[in-house]
Every structure is written in C-alpha cells, then in structure tokens.
C-alpha cells in the first residue's frame, strides 16, 4: 500500500513547536514525525507526518485539531510518497563500516573482511541497522568496549531492527541474547541475518511492543541491555527498562541526538543507573550507564 505525508511549511522555531504538538497527539502510536530544513536562507522548514492512504481522513482531522489553537490559519499540505524502496536505494554502494573490532559490510564487500575482523554481513533491506548510521556504529563500538571490560551472562537487544547488535553480542561472547522488535517483518529479517552470520542459535527473536511480552520475565534480568531507538521513548521507558537490569548490569542507549544527551542521562539517573561513558558519531550519541 502506498504512503503519503501531511506537512506544514514554517520557520524553524514554529516547526519545532509543531513537532512537539504532533508528538503529543501521536506519541503513543507508530507514526513517523519529522522536521526538515527546506531553505536555509529563508528559514523555511517542513514538519511532516507519514501515513498510509487508508488512514488519510482520520489523521488529517487529528493533525488539524492538534494545531488549530496555536496555528489556526496554517495550511496542512498533502504529498504522495513514491513507491520506492528508499532504504535499499540510499544504501547502494555504501562501503564497509568499522566500529571497534566489528566490520559491518554488505554481501558485495565480503572481500574487504580481514582475518581478525568480527565481520557482520547486513544487506540493505526492510529493517533498520546496517552500521552506516551513527547510532548503530556507536552501539557497536560501545558493545565492544563494555563486553571487553565485563563479560555479561545474558543480553537484551530492545528494538533489534536488522539484528546487527544482537549478532554483534553473540559474535563476542557465547551467551543467550533476547532480541525484540515491534515490527514482525524486522524480526523475520533479523532472524535471517542471524543465520547468515553464523549465529542461528543463542538468539531468541521475539515480536514485542516495548516491554509487553512474557519473554522479558522469562529470559531476564539482563546483564546487558541495548536500546537503539529514539530519545523520547527511551526516556519514557527508563523506569521499566531498569527493572529488567541485573544488579551491576550495563545499559547502552542510542538513537539520541547530542542535544538530547543530558535529558536522557537525567531520566536514567532518576531510574537508578549512572552515566559511565558517551561516544559521539555524526551528531548522534551512544551512552553507557551502569
């Protein structure tokens, strides 16, 4: 089914405020909401929400209701998104990525693997996480560092996407890993990636929204929890996430802009874990707490 977006065109300050209003309206639901700079000189920004055609009337009404008080005369525009696999298209020709001892590469770059690399083969596809984004690469580097310092007895990869982080843990240490994602397609792709990378066993792949699954009680508590999601849901889930952490365990968080770092750290300090280290990559941060 094709996708479309509703969007507004405003200044940067207004765009950020609209983003907050739409996030309040749709924050608990699975809609992508984003701001994009269109014209730097004229300070024109677009704030967009992406949806499917069959949701059009309901979502437009909710967008208008969310904005009417503070932006009563602001037009909400509509655009159909071309039916193109943008993930695969944008990642064509990407070179291998090194992060710690890991080398993440596509199947076309197998010849780039060195004898001592911990190689992970991930092709562009339907799930996030090929190592090229600063958040994924930062997590891989932090996993290498944390596991070197203290071998975990088990691990949780929350929001596994392509499965690259769960696969990385298994390549470092032979311990059980629970990998979950809200998207069943991502879970299927991740499981296939695990088999392709020589770890068909030892990773339990589960479809689970947030912590709403019996799997967390079944396999936890965890010595290592990794969550590469986004700052807002990470902050919201802080108390619940920490309840699944074993005493002395480590938390690795990413999907966080550098400007959001202290807010996330504060949320997790309040939940009982303290900041250990931060890695910066391309405007994104990966945080280790314990």
Curated annotation (Swiss-Prot):
Catalyzed reaction equations: L-lysyl-[protein] + 3 S-adenosyl-L-methionine = N(6),N(6),N(6)-trimethyl-L-lysyl-[protein] + 3 S-adenosyl-L-homocysteine + 3 H(+)
Keyword annotations: Cytoplasm, Methyltransferase, S-adenosyl-L-methionine, Transferase
Organism ancestry: Bacteria, Pseudomonadati, Pseudomonadota, Alphaproteobacteria, Hyphomicrobiales
Keyword Lipid metabolism: no
Entry protein name: Ribosomal protein L11 methyltransferase
Gene3D superfamilies from the UniProt entry: Vaccinia Virus protein VP39 (3.40.50.150)
Highest taxon, organism lineage: Bacteria
Annotated gene: prmA
Family, per entry: Belongs to the methyltransferase superfamily. PrmA family.
GO CC annotation terms, alphabetical: cytoplasm
